[in-house]
């Protein structure tokens, strides 16, 4: 049976945390900030965590990462 390959686009977007979670960055942060409040922009700068419902699928894409 062939080895699983890491999905390279996903590997660039997610980082593993110490407890085995996955860290991600928020969407809507590249342009068009004039429609967002100061609070929204500040909160979008912080990283988020991958939800439990998406975790299994993303872990499978990142199977080759340590």
Curated annotation (Swiss-Prot):
PROSITE patterns on file: RIBOSOMAL_L35 (PS00936)
Database matches in Pfam families: Ribosomal_L35p
Keywords: Ribonucleoprotein, Ribosomal protein
Example of a GO biological process term: translation
TM region(s), chain numbering: none
Gene Ontology CC entries for this record: cytosolic large ribosomal subunit
Region of interest (Disordered), ranges: 1-66
Gene3D superfamilies cross-referenced by the UniProt entry: 4.10.410.60
Keyword Ribonucleoprotein in annotation: yes
Positions with biased composition (Basic residues): 1-16, 23-45
Molecular functions per Gene Ontology: structural constituent of ribosome
Family matches, as PANTHER family: 54S RIBOSOMAL PROTEIN BL35M (PTHR33343), LARGE RIBOSOMAL SUBUNIT PROTEIN BL35M (PTHR33343:SF1)
HAMAP family according to UniProt: Ribosomal_bL35 (MF_00514)
Sequence similarity: Belongs to the bacterial ribosomal protein bL35 family.
Protein name according to UniProt: Large ribosomal subunit protein bL35
Source organism of the structure: Latilactobacillus sakei subsp. sakei (strain 23K) (Lactobacillus sakei subsp. sakei)
Gene that this polypeptide is encoded by: rpmI
């Amino acid at each position: 049976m062939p080895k699983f390959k890491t999905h390279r686009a996903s590997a660039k977007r997610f980082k593993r945390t110490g407890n085995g979670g996955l860290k991600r960055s928020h969407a809507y942060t590249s342009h068009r900030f004039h429609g967002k409040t100061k609070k929204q922009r500040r909160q979008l700068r912080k990283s988020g965590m991958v939800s439990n419902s998406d975790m299994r699928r993303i872990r499978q894409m990142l199977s080759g990462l340590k």
